Curated annotation (Swiss-Prot):
GO biological process: early endosome to late endosome transport; endosome organization; endosome to lysosome transport; lysosome organization; protein localization to perinuclear region of cytoplasm; protein transport
Low complexity bias spans: 478-501, 523-535
Species of the source: Homo sapiens (Human)
Region (Disordered): 465-548, 573-644
Upper classification of the organism: Eukaryota, Metazoa, Chordata, Craniata, Vertebrata
Function: Component of the FTS/Hook/FHIP complex (FHF complex). The FHF complex may function to promote vesicle trafficking and/or fusion via the homotypic vesicular protein sorting complex (the HOPS complex). FHF complex promotes the distribution of AP-4 complex to the perinuclear area of the cell.
Residues that bear Phosphoserine: S467, S510, S523, S529, S533, S859, S897
Protein name: FHF complex subunit HOOK-interacting protein 1B
Family statement: Belongs to the FHIP family.
Annotated Gene Ontology cellular component terms: FHF complex
Subunit structure comment from the entry: Component of the FTS/Hook/FHIP complex (FHF complex), composed of AKTIP/FTS, FHIP1B, and one or more members of the Hook family of proteins HOOK1, HOOK2, and HOOK3. The FHF complex associates with the homotypic vesicular sorting complex (the HOPS complex).
InterPro entries for the chain: FHIP, FHIP_C, FHIP_KELAA_motif
Keywords: Phosphoprotein, Protein transport, Transport
Amino acid sequence: MERMNWLSRLASRGPGHRIPQGANLQTPVMADPETCLMVFKNHWSQVVRILERQGPRAAPGGADDLSAVRNHTYQMLTLLAEDRAVPSAPTGPGPLLEFALHEDLLTRVLTWQLQWDELGDGVEERRAEQLKLFEMLVSEARQPLLRHGPVREALLTLLDACGRPVPSSPALDEGLVLLLSQLCVCVAQEPSLLEFFLQPPPEPGAAPRLLLFSRLVPFVHREGTLGQQARDALLLLMALSAGSPTVGRYIADHSYFCPVLATGLSALYSSLPRKIEVPGDDWHCLRREDWLGVPALALFMSSLEFCNAVIQVAHPLVQKQLVDYIHNGFLVPVMGPALHKTSVEEMIASTAYLELFLRSISEPALLRTFLRFLLLHRHDTHTILDTLVARIGSNSRLCMVSLSLFRTLLNLSCEDVLLQLVLRYLVPCNHVMLSQKPAVRDVDLYGRAADKFLSLIPRCCRHHAPSPPRPEHASWARGPGSPSVDSSSVTTVPRPSTPSRLALFLRQQSLGGSESPGPAPCSPGLSASPASSPGRRPTPAEEPGELEDNYLEYLREARRGVDRCVRACRTWSAPYDGERPSPEPSPFGSRTKKRSLLPEEDRNNVGEGEEEELGRRGRAGGAGEGPGHLPPPQLNGVPGSWPEGAKKVRLVPKEGAGELLEGISEGMAGLEGFGQELRELEVALSNGGTGSESPLEPPLPLEEEEAYESFTCPPEPPGPFLSSPLRTLNQLPSQPFTGPFMAVLFAKLENMLQNSVYVNFLLTGLVAQLACHPQPLLRSFLLNTNMVFQPSVKSLLQVLGSVKNKIENFAASQEDFPALLSKAKKYLIARGKLDWAEGPAAGPAPRRSDPLVKSRRPSLGELLLRHAHSPTRARQAAQLVLQPGRDGAGLGLSGGSPGASTPVLLTRGGAPERQGEALRVKNAVYCAVIFPEFLKELAAISQAHAVTSPFLLETSEEGSGPLISGCGPLNP
């Protein structure tokens, strides 16, 4: 009973219930130092009489001795915790501590108690008591006890005893972690103490021991507060190891810390759900509130965040080792096969997990190894990135999750990612006519591209309501260069001194007034209009034009997006302007010869050190090298080798060159290898998009027919999927190729009418992200409407023109198209309003029965927001207060609330034969709403480039944060 009472008193010192250092203990009130010392010595004399007997006695009376020692020890340690240094010697030990150190009190008592372990009875309970007692002493002591060797020796003896095989229990684990956590806090306050806990090897050739560290490692992946407390304590030690080479070498060379972290991630990943149940049509990524509701995923994310923090603060040796173990022990053996599962549900889950991991990582070194895995690791002869690109062509949710993943990758502003996806195909400048190469660097200063994009808005989607009166002083801005004015009906007025590229800004300001450029749920273009007042219901003439007068907000958002990309790309290795890197192929240089000396299998397995050396040599002598000899990609500044298919010379042979290849010297073997790898890549890509094909999908156009054929057809036999003859598999690429990524994006974009509204939101957002990049090669490819491309290369303008024609043809064939278009606009606006508004008055919350996600489902407004890049459409959709329809039946989209998970525009009966037609019409009408907004966004981005690029590309602004070479700011 006495022992239980003692435990109950110690239990109050557990986590969350520890007595503050300034509070009085429940045991005897402190008297003067002389009295305390006398009482302390009296307790010690009682203990010494028991200790001097010949070991513990199992005979009757032995248990009484153990209980007496325990009681006296508790009283002594309570007095010792209250001991203070005398005023005459403030830096020395207090009288009680000095006596305890002289008598070696702690070690002698602990050694005697540990002898009872040999009897095998009550070991677990006694160990928990000892841990609690020492934790109380360390946490409540008013003197720096750890400075004294006898105290450290006693603690190390106890920690060593905790490594003996003892039945584990929650109380024992909690006591051990709590004591270790307190010790780590004390050591963090005095870092010089850390090396005193590093014990020398017990025998020659053995490894040193750091029990303070090794006893915490087994708890690193534990669930709940216990695991979190262990991880916090380990982080303190990691931060201390950064300044201690001895401790850093111990952790890297003599501990299993890094392997435990990496293998723990693998084990935790295997317990994640293999299928994510998401009935909502708009789900495309895992948000924080999603994974917090899944214990297995929450535990994995805690461990991943811990790895991220360790790499951030640990010693460089530990950082490098942990990164290598995560790559070789988690990414390659676990994530690689998981991304290539045969089940579509498993592929969706693994892709969503990968996107979440990339979005959650903040440390450049860890992010670098994830990107190295995506860009360079090969699974079944093709890279992970190629597999993910192919899945964009799927017509299932796999497409949405893949688009979300690439959105996250582009948000990183990593040179290597964009190089592998797009730039390496544009660098040779084979996609443009020879006479057009100098125009790659041209900047559209007069808004001609914006005018062209806005002219593609289908007539059936334009708002013809009377426009508000315009002040006469702004009439000069509506000149022939204005994108929205018919130049044939405008009388040209003398141009003012203001640059014409600012005319559109001035006209928008005169129309809509001025407002702070900060993000807001309402359009600045409508802020001065009474139609946008929250308390006013829009008139019937105004209702269809809710999204018409928002171009100024698109300009502001485009300016922010382009500025962000310019800042992030300022440290890239080349401007990619058609001259640097050089588009002209050159003879094989020394770097190529060095690479060609390696056998093919050795080239695929070049070590990281060799990759760095080859990268340095290539950069030193590659000023005049061609596109096949670009400097190897840098993963956040770390040189690496070119992936297969990108490291060889790319030449475009003329007609009849096939017969000449046999006579080319051995030095040209790289060209054949490149062609063969490209063909293998195209065949392999066909295995990625396993999603179901839409029965409503029309025949595809001629755009990049060689590449897109592989996304949709099995490799054997290559059926006649496209309308033009296919290139045979043994034929070298004889036509310009802009890469599989742009090919699949353009093909998906051209089929906007068949895509769901959610796919189109993600797809247009991804294209807008690419368009914001300042590299002239990419900017001219997407936004230069005057550029003349090769006949086999389809431009973005052609793709958009095709979509425009399809929308107009659909509108002409649909009698009730205006009514459906109005309903679709109202639905999108109301849907965004539901999730932007705060409070219960905003409308009913969307319902969800998904067991994975316990919170509200993502809204269209959040899809439009695109998590950082284009919140424009979301704010426009949220600008109106929900108003019931004129017939009092709400918006009439699906007979329910505007937040229903699957809106249906048509309700022409429930027969199965009607469902396909209803889906086709619904997707087409939503496309007609999204397409004009996308054109406005592209027009605004093209104008933002003209205003932004000349300034930020030449100067660097202070306070923009540290930039990482090769990857830009990872967390802008």
